[in-house]
Amino acid sequence: MLPPVRCFTCGRPLGHLWPRFRELVASGKTPGEALDELGVDRYCCRRTLFTSVTYIEHAAKYRVGIHVPPERLKMWG
């Protein structure tokens, strides 16, 4: 999942806040403190940023695509 571009409920743009949010949390602030510092007041926007997880690191470990054995390909023509 990519970082959210907009709030799923109200549509407020949030994509520009994602890098700073991750940076603040990595520096030791709680997610709530980071959201307060970024000025995210609406609970729907806070939920969208707080619950977003990037899975790209996990997905990159797996190969994309399906291996089809040659004998199965002959079966289709």
Curated annotation (Swiss-Prot):
It catalyses: RNA(n) + a ribonucleoside 5'-triphosphate = RNA(n+1) + diphosphate. Its EC number is 2.7.7.6. Binds 1 zinc ion. One of its GO terms (biological process) is DNA-templated transcription. Its main location: cytoplasm. It is found in: Cytoplasm. It holds the Pfam family RNA_pol_N. Zn(2+) binds at C7, C10, C44, C45. It comes from the Archaea. Part of the RNA polymerase complex. DNA-dependent RNA polymerase (RNAP) catalyzes the transcription of DNA into RNA using the four ribonucleoside triphosphates as substrates. Belongs to the archaeal Rpo10/eukaryotic RPB10 RNA polymerase subunit family. This is DNA-directed RNA polymerase subunit Rpo10. It comes from Aeropyrum pernix (strain ATCC 700893 / DSM 11879 / JCM 9820 / NBRC 100138 / K1).
